[in-house]
């Protein structure tokens, strides 16, 4: 089995006089110009060497640093492209957040299916890494929000069938570019080390370097050239084997924040990136240090790199080691640095939230919405912990302003709404924490991590809050240092997966040509002629035989993008078969039929025209309703799911508040304005990158298509990537009627609507219902609402009167107005009485008797046999046991607390017999007590 050692022996290293060394501390191999160097240069092998000793010739702000880095690569022949959103699920279905610049080009470009927007290129990509959340603030270098500047080159062997081929540049040139940039900002190249660190991810692998300077990793250079192969010659650190592939991708990442920090030499990266925010938070929290304290904090910052939770077993032990090295008490050091660590985290998290909400993420209980909510709640707790009297929306707005987002009002509204919801959630969840803490206190065990994560997931209650409540009842909490990383890992996954179904793995299917789709050329066409290329025998849903028919061309639209499949018939020379479903597999359209039309036969296809027209109207209406919702609710609104239908359709949209009736009416009004405008619906097939550059990633409301060209559908000012069938003009829809709005999950509203003929049918149906109600009430349809309200009020009043009369009747029975039997039970009078009323009457009678100091046994035969037993304080009778025995006599059961219980059974004929034995049951119960 081969390793990658040869992959690291570059001609550039040989020409420049590099040496390959092994770190005496960690054992890693690295390359350096300094032949006497013994360590790799990365913490914990070395501390930060640039604090108070900036590593560049000049000091840069984040903006200046980004500009300098991009300019360098532009001069080196790279095209600069605009960054993508932080919500990677806008163009990918396998991940949620953008964590590296290479995410911009996965999977279509890296796989060779699509060309890159430029080659080579450079991009400064905003990223969010949830797995770093617990390190933020502690190590001095970790930020959850950061910009990764990547210079990328996409190479492929000549003659391969990819969207690009030929060699742009590879490892030697990439390393040369890296050193060129370092030299450009004044770095002493003798101090730089290149640590060998093979990279593995997503089924690919390759050699990689970590570029270290004065204790700080400034860049990672990944050379993606391997793919997983059980017969591959390279065994990688994930335990799998890999083989060389015919594509090679230069994937580099330079942390712009870290470069900024290196240029300034501040104690932490946070002072370099968020100076104004940190000063503001220190002032709000009232943090002031003496000169001696400030000097101690400053010295400690140089060792902060040793607090990486991924590298140390216990943070407090690691901090104690730093304190010992500094010659101070560990508790004293923690008192000084912990509030600062919280402030650093608040600054970083506020930027994360600005990125998330600025890019349209809406808080919810799933996906990116959950991650946003988690960060927001943690940030709110940190703000409260440091005692800063500042609204969270103000802190997030400071970052949104700096990042240049135009939807700042919406961002602030989202934050305020979430903070309010969080308060309500904490109030509800506090009772659950008390119960759980008491349970583990009784066991003498700490509250386990799984319970802490569940409390956070369900109620947003953080470990520190659990610890405070648990301490009051004698329970302990020992949350892991990486708690928030564990929580994020539960949710930081995309919805990856491919559609299954019959035919997906059939070898014959793979050999068939792609089906020519006629419905794009003529969405109004209903008839066509075709040749049957193949027929696959299947098992139908009812167990009967079924067939998947492949034609050379088709007018039948296959199910996709939330639009159901067309149905219809295929007619041959001597028979006709029904087409009951249509699916597409890798470009081949499968027509599910009830009979075999015959391979090689010539057939005529006829689709159900009325069904197609209704689906077209509903699909175009879906685009219109989403657009109208964005106009009314805000630009943060995005499609979270859709299902078109013949009679109605539904669209799920992201929004942070409930949509009330007046808002629904406004969305409907805007949608119908577009319909009445009779706007032309246009379709085009532009280059993917050109479309993304012009319209952004809001194109992908209904899914992410593959390919170099994508189909765009223009409806009024709305543009979406879409493969569905549409009307030619919006006026053909006729009208759109929103039937219902409901919250299907937190942060997602579902709008159900009908379009065209279906809208008319729904309105007519509602009118029929209204007229039917009017006839029952003997009023005109216009008078139904007022009459219904009056009847409802009268009904409530009568119900209250009935309840009052029941109480009066119960009191009368209890005071001697009934025919009950009185017996003595342990010196207290017990009344055994039959009252053939409902359960409310039984309970009222029993309560009245108990209030009078009597034991009550009340039975009813109105609905089977039912009992209620009530016992005053101080009487040695257990009501639950008594009612259980009585209920058993009538074939049922019951129970309850000792003072009041109820039960019953189906055998009403034995009710009187059971009541006649109640005195004995009461006597036995009193004796037992």
Curated annotation (Swiss-Prot):
Keywords: Aminoacyl-tRNA synthetase, ATP-binding, Cytoplasm, Ligase, Metal-binding, Nucleotide-binding, Protein biosynthesis, RNA-binding, tRNA-binding, Zinc
Catalytic activity field: tRNA(Ala) + L-alanine + ATP = L-alanyl-tRNA(Ala) + AMP + diphosphate
InterPro entries named in the record: aa-tRNA-synth_II/BPL/LPL, Ala-tRNA-lgiase_IIc, Ala-tRNA-ligase_IIc_anticod-bd, Ala-tRNA-synth_IIc_core, Ala-tRNA-synth_IIc_N, Ala-tRNA_lgiase_arc, Ala-tRNA_ligase, DHHA1_dom
Cofactor: Zn(2+)
Record GO terms (molecular function): alanine-tRNA ligase activity; aminoacyl-tRNA deacylase activity; ATP binding; tRNA binding; zinc ion binding
GO biological process: alanyl-tRNA aminoacylation
Example of a GO cellular component annotation carried by this entry: cytoplasm
Subcellular location: Cytoplasm
Chief subcellular location: cytoplasm
Record-listed Zn(2+) binding positions: 619, 623, 722, 726
EC number annotated for this UniProt entry: 6.1.1.7
Cofactor binding note: Binds 1 zinc ion per subunit.
Written domain comment of the UniProt record: Consists of three domains; the N-terminal catalytic domain, the editing domain and the C-terminal C-Ala domain. The editing domain removes incorrectly charged amino acids, while the C-Ala domain, along with tRNA(Ala), serves as a bridge to cooperatively bring together the editing and aminoacylation centers thus stimulating deacylation of misacylated tRNAs.
Function of the molecule: Catalyzes the attachment of alanine to tRNA(Ala) in a two-step reaction: alanine is first activated by ATP to form Ala-AMP and then transferred to the acceptor end of tRNA(Ala). Also edits incorrectly charged Ser-tRNA(Ala) and Gly-tRNA(Ala) via its editing domain.
Family affiliation: Belongs to the class-II aminoacyl-tRNA synthetase family.
Name under which the protein is recorded: Alanine--tRNA ligase
Taxonomic placement: Archaea, Methanobacteriati, Methanobacteriota, Stenosarchaea group, Halobacteria
